[in-house]
Structure formats: C-alpha cells, structure tokens
Amino acid sequence: MIKIILFLLSFTQSFSQQVCKPITGFNEVIVQYNQPNVRFENGLLNMYLTQDTGGSGIIIGPPIHYGEISVTFKASYGNNIVSAFYLKAENGDEVDFEMVMNKTIPNRTIQTAFYYRGIPLYEVNARYFITDRPLSDVYNKYTIVWTPDYYEWRLNDALLNRVSRFDTNTFPDTISSIKLTIWDAKPGRWGGPGVDWNQQPFILSISAIEIKCNPTSVTSSPLPVTTQTQTLKSSISPSTITHQIPTNLTSKEPMISFVNIVKPFDYLTLISYLFYIFI
C-alpha cells in the first residue's frame, strides 16, 4: 500500500511538470547551452554569438502543451546569423520563428515554419515575410498561439500565418519546450555567404517574455496567408511596438537558472514505477 501511495505521488508530481506555467519576465529562464554567452544587462536578457565562443540557447519555463507564448526581442544582424524563437518536442515536432539574414532581403525577412516528427519539409511548410524596418534595429513582439486546432504566428499582435489541424496531416501536437537560440547557419543558400566576424559580437536581445496557458480551442478558419512572401509595413512601425523597452527597469537581476530543464513525464518513467511496486 505504501509503495502504491508513493507511486501515485511520484506520478502526479512528474505529470504536473508537463503543465504550462503562466510567466511574465525572466525568472523562468534556463540556459540550455553556453552559459557565459547569456547575460542580463541593463534590464535586457542578451544572448551572444562570437567566433571564439559560438552561439547560445535558452529554455523558458517548463514544457508546454497549448498556450500563447510571446517574446519581445531584437534579432541579430549579419549574414549567416540566425535568431530563432521556437517550440521543440523530443520527437522532432517543431514550430518556429526564424530571422534569416540571407532570405530575400537581408535583415528584414521573417520565416515561419513547422515540422512534424522531424521531417524536413522546409519549402513546403515555410512562409516568408518582409518588414519595412531592419529586424536588428527595433524590438518586436513575436507570438506563437497554440491550440488543439491551430497554430498562429503573430508579429506585434498582427496575424502573419495560421496553420489548422484540418489543413494538414502533419500537425505538430506534442508537448514542447520553449526555446530561443542564436547560431551560425554556415555558408549556403539558406544562411548566406558566410559570417563577417569583423561585425561581432552578434546579439539577440530580449526585452520581455509572457506566457499564457491553455487558451480555449475554437474551430479553425482557412489559412489567411496565400503567398510565400508578404510585405509588412504598418505593423513594424515603432509606434505600434508597445513592448519595445520595459519602462520599469531596475538594477535587480532576475533568477536565471543554469541547469538543464526537467524532461516531461514519459512512459519509461511509468514502467520503472510499476516495476518498483510489483517486484
């Protein structure tokens, strides 16, 4: 009986680690790799990339399964330098924003994309959007809305793209970690001709983070974006960026963790618990 009680308590605790947590600010940030390159400076969370130290990556909060995730940041400049904000599951499901410096118009191209089980359908599931201001000049609010029925990608609260579960048989729907990374894509058609290291350091600068959990599911409407490339003008204007810089900056630094995130509950854990009970 005691073993069963312990099992149920452990099961409940492990399962609760999967639940999305409402977050505002930087206190739930976990450095995924390259700790020295992630720094809290003047009220901003800055992620660095240099030739000697490489890029950096963070995870925000616990894993999520449906919610609205907003990160306000200024992307880095530079050929081959990719600033990315995305949801990533262990089975390869992925939903992302990527600021690609070599696509169409350098420093003004946003890519939205999704991948199912790691299948690399890059040109099928990707959409590109051109802004009228360089992405490295201003802080923009990037939002991913995830419901059981659809994903939405938003820029400064304006809808860029929507993918419905009913429009594809490769809809990513696995509990995922929330990540931001800055990295060198290496020379090539997607990333660019190569990094000009005379421009370093390259910085992805974050001014705000907000996570809202479990929005009500609604019936999806058809995709509003019908072309591969769309030009954005008014939505990128500084006057519409309400979260450009926090107005209540203080010298107190948030608690940023430098540990690996706890993995979601999986069936191997359940099997080990059952083995413990009955053996």
Describe the residue ranges of each PLM region.
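N-terminal signal peptide
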Residues: 9-20, 275-279
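Secretory/extracellular carbohydrate-interaction modules
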Residues: 47-111
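Extracellular/lumenal carbohydrate-interaction signature centered on repeated Trp-anchored short motifs
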Residues: 59-67, 130-137, 170-171
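Short, aromatic/His-centered strand-loop micro-motif at the edge of beta-sheets
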Residues: 118-139
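Localized edge beta-strand/strand-to-loop motifs within extracellular or lumenal beta-rich domains
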Residues: 136-152, 156
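Aromatic sugar-binding interfaces of carbohydrate-active proteins
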Residues: 152-210, 214-218, 222-225, 230-232, ...
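Cleavable C-terminal sorting propeptides in eukaryotic secreted/cell-surface proteins
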Residues: 255-279
